Regions:
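Compositionally biased, intrinsically disordered low-complexity regions enriched in proline and serine
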Residues: 70, 142-146, 185
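Well-ordered, non-membrane alpha-helical segments in soluble/globular domains
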Residues: 65-66, 131-136, 168-173
Length: 196
């Protein structure tokens, strides 16, 4: 869909994903999508209930992050071309931000306000959201906010559990069309942050 719609995507994968789906990563790179780091082992950096605490040391954080970049380098993804880091679970604190910056990277995160990130949920989960509900949350947010979705980073998962038969990515073409009708231009992370 992204190729057909000429939309640049930004993909953040773990080292394990790069190992298992190297051919997909190569194809995404060949198609000029951004490929970035999402950690090697998808570690939880801070407790859910005490965000100001840490579950990792600086050394373990950096070792894990560097391992992710090594897997990327094995696929021809140059670190200089991948300066953005999306933390696992999109959960981090000030220490993680500082350590990321000290490593010469920019920590980014999805923009909160929609349910796009719930596209991984399955019907047996208490936080399950249908694809229709997710799509509507995005369009409602756009209509209700003064700045709409300008500068917004929507987080979608490239794949989901087979138990989720209602795949949100099947609604992607519709979402792209609707956003374009509303006057949006979908751009790369680099372009977004250059214009910021």
């Amino acid at each position: 869909v992204l190729k057909e719609q000429r939309v640049p995507g930004s993909f953040f994968f773990t080292g394990a994903f790069y190992d298992q789906f190297g051919n997909l990563a190569r194809q995404l790179k060949a198609d000029n999508h951004y490929l970035g780091a999402h950690s090697e082992q998808h570690l939880l950096y801070a407790p859910w209930t005490m965000r100001d605490s840490l579950l990792v040391s600086r050394d373990s954080f950096l070792t894990d992050l560097e391992a992710n970049y090594e897997k990327m380098a094995d696929l021809g993804i140059d670190r200089a071309a991948a300066p953005f880091f999306l933390p696992p679970f999109e959960w981090y604190n000030d220490s993680i931000v500082r350590w990321t910056a000290a490593a010469g990277l920019q920590l980014i995160n999805m923009t909160y306000g929609t349910l796009s990130h719930a596209d991984y949920t399955t019907p047996d989960m208490p936080n399950y959201r249908s694809s229709d509900r997710i799509l509507q949350s995005i369009l409602d947010y756009e209509a209700e906010q003064a700045n709409g979705l300008n500068g917004f980073l929507l987080l979608l998962h490239i794949g989901t559990d087979p138990a989720r038969t209602d795949k949100f990515y099947l609604h992607l073409e519709s979402l792209i069309g609707e956003l374009r009708e509303r006057g949006y231009r979908l751009v790369t992370l680099q372009e977004l942050f250059q214009n910021d």
